[in-house]
């Protein structure tokens, strides 16, 4: 009886949001899911287009007023806290608007929490990193958007409300200290930390100025992909061009060891092998 709440917070990243919606729709998990899009741009609200408006799994919330202070938001932690108020699932995935979620991401995450039901969180040991110079690689990092967590525990431990960022460490530190985050070596990357976008689509990367005392406003000033029309999904061919890069990376990485970790043929066959059919 799992319901997976994919929760996206966003500000002036219109093209990224369209791509991310499409990646949600292309998840191959057969089960209950929802995508909450929490937009804090009060000048350019997000509206689902005709193709998306009939999909009951997708919900857009346009709001720039902190539910606790009744003032405009001044940090991402408060935004994430308010965004999960709209989630109705049992489990939470931070669906970062500018990153890449491969078709098996949710399915593998659910497989993980089923294997380790006493855990509050699960993640694959390795994800991937798409650098700004176009280099795509297997990468190990905390990468909170690669984690699936019990939503009740996320609500209980919350987010750091600080302008510099690092908001996930409020819950993440507790999970790690209590050994309730399972980092699974028997896994395959399903998420990519993406710095490859260029031009207006790239905008500002908050992780690039992490802990700057005014990181929140730097991000707002540097992100200008305005919503000037309704949201529509990416085409199948556009998505497939992205997916094929990862298929090549993962296929070429089978049985190669990275600090004791390796992608097995079994996991490739289980999760990746049908990648060419996910966008039909």
Placement of each model-derived feature along the sequence:
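Short aromatic/hydrophobic "clamp" motif used to bind/position activated sugar donors
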Residues: 92
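Short beta-strand/loop segment that forms part of the nucleotide-sugar
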Residues: 32-43, 61-66
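Conserved donor NDP-sugar-binding/catalytic core segment of glycosyltransferases
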Residues: 106-135
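The conserved acidic donor/metal-binding loop of glycosyltransferases
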Residues: 96-100
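C-terminal catalytic/acceptor-binding lobe
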Residues: 162-165, 169-280
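Short, acidic, metal-binding catalytic loop of nucleotide-sugar glycosyltransferases
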Residues: 22-32
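Cell-envelope/extracellular polymer assembly enzymes that use nucleotide-activated donors
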Residues: 2-5, 34, 170
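Glycine-rich, basic loop-to-helix element that forms the pyrophosphate-binding segment
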Residues: 66-87
């Amino acid at each position: 009886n799992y319901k997976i709440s994919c929760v996206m917070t966003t500000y002036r990243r219109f093209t990224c949001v369209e791509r991310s919606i499409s990646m949600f729709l292309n998840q191959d998990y057969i089960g209950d899911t929802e995508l909450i899009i929490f937009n804090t741009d009060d000048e350019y609200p997000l509206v689902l287009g005709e193709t998306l408006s009939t999909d009951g799994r997708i919900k857009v919330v346009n709001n720039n007023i902190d539910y606790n202070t009744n003032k405009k938001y001044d940090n991402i932690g408060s935004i994430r806290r308010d965004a999960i108020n709209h989630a109705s699932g049992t489990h939470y995935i931070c669906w970062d608007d500018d990153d890449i979620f491969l078709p098996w991401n949710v399915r593998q995450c659910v497989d993980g929490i089923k294997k380790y039901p006493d855990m509050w969180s699960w993640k694959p040991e390795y994800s991937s990193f798409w650098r700004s110079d176009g280099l795509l690689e297997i990468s190990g990092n905390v990468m909170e958007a690669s984690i699936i967590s019990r939503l009740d525990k996320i609500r209980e431990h919350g987010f750091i409300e600080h302008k510099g960022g690092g908001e996930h460490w409020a819950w993440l530190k507790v999970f790690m200290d209590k050994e309730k985050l399972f980092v699974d070596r028997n896994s395959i990357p399903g998420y990519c930390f993406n710095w490859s976008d260029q031009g207006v689509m790239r905008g500002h990367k908050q992780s690039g100025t992490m802990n700057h005392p005014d990181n929140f406003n730097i991000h707002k000033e540097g992100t200008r992909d305005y919503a000037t029309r309704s949201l529509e999904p990416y085409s199948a061919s556009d998505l497939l061009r992205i997916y094929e890069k990862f298929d090549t990376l993962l296929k070429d990485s089978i049985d190669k060891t990275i600090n004791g970790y390796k992608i097995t043929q079994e996991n490739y066959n289980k999760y990746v092998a049908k990648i060419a059919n996910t966008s039909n």
